[in-house]
């Protein structure tokens, strides 16, 4: 179980309140697919993923990115129970989709990069540390069913 201090919770929730879920989610998933192209195999129904511009402009990537980032919103609301919050998604990704759990860590790291890019100086080292802790906790919660 991940323990967040009051300061970490405040840093996470304060920034989350400013996140454009649709824009940031689409960018994070798009970057994941560009930077780690082997992750594209899980999205074979998404159409054209042949280039970075095709991926970043793909409406299905954007829509699924929004869905993924919305689930991070559930994490923000349930920082003290990440494992429980992601139990069903862990089961889905393990049993049905067979996603390599390492991809959860990669997506979390990409999300931190996207947030840093969007928020600039506001994304201080302390804010980054809190978010990195959260995305690691989410990745571990999503990987739980695999163990």
UniProtKB/Swiss-Prot annotation:
It comes from the Eukaryota. The gene is HBG. Heme b binds at residues 64, 93. It comes from Elephas maximus (Indian elephant). The keyword NADP does not apply. InterPro entries: Globin, Globin-like_sf, Globin/Proto, Hemoglobin_b, Hemoglobin_oxygen_transport. Red blood cells. GO terms for molecular function: haptoglobin binding; heme binding; metal ion binding; organic acid binding; oxygen binding; oxygen carrier activity; peroxidase activity. Keywords: Heme, Iron, Metal-binding, Oxygen transport, Transport. The keyword rRNA-binding does not apply. Heterotetramer of two alpha chains and two gamma chains in fetal hemoglobin (Hb F). Belongs to the globin family. GO terms for cellular component: blood microparticle; haptoglobin-hemoglobin complex; hemoglobin complex. The lineage of its organism: Eukaryota, Metazoa, Chordata, Craniata, Vertebrata. Residues 3-147 form the Globin domain. GO terms for biological process: hydrogen peroxide catabolic process. This is Hemoglobin subunit gamma. Gamma chains make up the fetal hemoglobin F, in combination with alpha chains.
């Amino acid at each position: 179980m991940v323990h967040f201090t009051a300061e970490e919770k405040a840093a996470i929730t304060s920034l989350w309140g400013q996140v454009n879920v649709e824009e940031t989610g689409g960018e994070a998933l798009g970057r994941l697919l560009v930077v780690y192209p082997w992750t594209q195999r899980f999205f074979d129904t998404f159409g054209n993923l042949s280039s970075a511009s095709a991926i970043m402009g793909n409406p299905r990537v954007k829509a699924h990115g929004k869905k993924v980032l919305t689930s991070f919103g559930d994490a923000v609301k349930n920082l003290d129970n990440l494992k429980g919050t992601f139990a069903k998604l862990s089961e889905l990704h393990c049993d049905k989709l067979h996603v390599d759990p390492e991809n959860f860590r990669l997506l979390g790291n990409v999300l931190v990069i996207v947030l840093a890019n969007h928020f600039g100086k506001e994304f201080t080292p302390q804010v980054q540390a809190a978010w990195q802790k959260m995305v690691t906790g989410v990745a571990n919660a999503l990987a739980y069913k695999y163990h």
